[in-house]
Amino acid sequence: MEWKMVKQMVKCAALTLAAVFMLSAVSAQAAGFKKEYKMQVTVGPKFYWGMGATKFAELVKEKTNGQINIKPYFGSALLKGAQLKSSQMVAKGVIDCAMDSTINISPVIPQANVFHLPFFLNDFENLDKVKNGEAGQAIFDAMKAKRLQPLAWAENGFRQLTNSKISVKTPADMKGLRVRVVGNPMFIDTFKALGADPVNMNWGDAVAGFQQGVVDGQENPVGVLIPVQIFQYHKYTTMWNYLVDPLIFYWNQKQWKKFPKEIQDAILEAAQEAGRFETALCRAGLDGDTSINILKNEFNYDMAVPNPVKFMEEKGMTVNFLSDDERKAFIDATQSVYDKWVGKIGKDVVEKAKADMAR
């Protein structure tokens, strides 16, 4: 008899849960919400960036009681790999939302290139001041003017140099080095100013180039270097923080304005929480114990690679950090790039960033 009662209770609970989900779905449809909101994500789900997108989708579903369901499309699947078109497609409403890089939005939002000025930002403290200061707000305002609704910051990280030829410590070491870079013109200008030979190519072609010895190096954040196992191709890493690659959660503005305030608030809260999680993933082991503790205490998450520098060294890589004097030499060598791009970014935004860092 007792077992029969237990079975009835389990059945009743299952029916109740099903009813809750059905009611959520019905209420979502009645409110005019889509069954699925498509989210553009450049990388795959196993990268920190991809993990942040997954966390965002999970949190939005939880905080809206299942009314808003986001499906991340990884590897720029919605764009057939054309990641630089992401902000345009979101603005048009072809794609609902994105977790995107400042690199990708910079053709539409040139103010975002303030993060890509060579050797302009050098640490997490200054990065946070700029993101959360007047310069960061100027970028968000520029996005709103382009029919994009910014939600929260996240991070891909400071981009570091790896190569198979030499431990880079001076601009002279860069001479003739054939380096794979992303298709942002400022990146190409920077490497040319350093005497390198920058090559814009997709990652698959770059790996083939590494294996064949026709491409010497590349630049990416540590959070990318570890999962792509860069140690298989390169011996040397230079931790030079030459520029940084923040991420932004954003939504189609027209669609966003139609959401009730309680839904907007829930999505904003989810974006901020997911951004904090993903940023901690990218900084773990690079900012002392700060991000490690955030992940453990706030998200109950333990890093598989808690010390990325040690990990690369254990894999046989030589990891070099620039001294202040060495960094100064790189700043001087790329001054022409800075001068060329300040006007294109907007001198007012650059000055705001300087003021943010001075606070």
For each predicted feature, which ranges?
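Short, low-complexity disordered leader/linker segments with a strong preference
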Residues: M1-E36, A358-R359
